[in-house]
Amino acid sequence: MATEYALRMGDGKRIFLTKEKIREELEAGAANAADLGEIPALSGDEIDRLAEILMMPGKAVSVEQGMEVPVTHDIGTIRLDGDQGNSGVGIPSSRLVGCMMHERAFGADTMELGHIDYSFKPVKPVVSNECQAMEVCQQNMIIPLFYGAMPNMGLYYTPDGPFENPGDLMKAFKIQEAWESMEHAADHLTRDTVWIMQKLFASGADGVNFDTTAAAGDGDFYGTLHAVEALRKEFPAMHIEVGMAGEMVLGMHGNLQYEGVTLAGLWPHQQASLVAKAGANVFGPVVNTNTSKTSPWNLARAVTFIKEAVKVSSLPCHVDMGMGVGGIPMLETPPIDAVTRASKAMVEVAGVDGIOIGVGDPLGMPISHIMASGMTGIRAAGDLVARMQFSKNMRIKEAKKYVAKKLDVDVMDLADEHVMRELREELDIGVITSVPGAAKGIAAKMNIEKLLDVRINSCELFRKQTGR
């Protein structure tokens, strides 16, 4: 009897497949992406490599040493303190504690602060509170800390917002009115996100993560791109990540354009250039998981789309890898075997520059991804590599080479805890455990500025406040 391997369906249910069936599913998934996106399918060698990763005997797998990449985040600390029947585990804790847990306990390379609703519009009435939280977090943390939220243009429609719901208008055949409603909502989305980030950047935020961009279709993408453009013009040094909501931009409007390109119907490799033109530093492409298909089918499909996006993008690509995207099952507690295999495949086959950790419980998401492919933050040199990706738009190899040269170590040493522990203490750039007298928070980041020849926004704020 042929050997069967334990794998998953897109909803997380365990299934058993033979090697021949795995390869058949991989080829079908890759072909689906190639057909839809009009892009190259995976080669035979790449299919073989994916099959090899899927059939590895261990429950958890990881990238080859030296191939580690930085991680960014969606949903911030909500996976710890949130409790809405979703992926939050309901631990009563402050957001400062949550952010520091990601930095000190999970080995995150970057982190983000976010409002419990995790959308920009609800932040407006409480922006002063968000600014306070950001400043306190920046005073205590070393890794890059973003403000993260969803553009979520749907909140601008009735009953939550001022503009009539375009879906209702379309049902009444009021097409022109529906278009105008979407255009007004997009303008307000741009205005609100820019205003909020003006406040947060003045409070020391390293930058912004636009998460789940285009969830409300092409109008959502349009408003976000214009927000990125405005922020880049006003704040040349702001770190900006744009993570998408889905693999294709839905044409809710259909006629909206950016830089002469119609937004409706764009696939990841076509979205990348527009995100770069708007002024982002990092692009977060997405491929949705089909819950009725197998994990090999979903993974090959995702890798095919993302590989092409990485190839054509001028920006570092941090693929979104939460539950229900990137070949990962749609389950609040994502299976560790599926998460680590998808993480490894995205790095080794798709060639991504980083992983954007998405929705899922702490063990199933940040811990699994960081164990599989992360650089482990201030345990090693992950925060330094991430800073160069965002400061100079460096792809992963260039960023690693730059940091290694500054530290006078081999690239392989950047994820070596033994090498970096001693070196970080010697350079006084922050260590993960408590060392009396060692630089922490702002002091450590000021030393990082000198080491990497970059400017860090929270340090600039400190100098402004102290007149130094």
From Swiss-Prot:
Tagged with keyword Cell inner membrane: no
Domain of life assignment: Archaea
InterPro entries the record matches: Dimeth_MeTrfase_MtbB
GO terms of biological process kind: methanogenesis; methylation
Enzyme Commission number(s) from the entry: 2.1.1.249
Keywords recorded for this protein, A-Z: Methanogenesis, Methyltransferase, Pyrrolysine, Transferase
Enzyme class: transferase
Family the entry assigns: Belongs to the dimethylamine methyltransferase family.
Protein name: Dimethylamine methyltransferase MtbB2
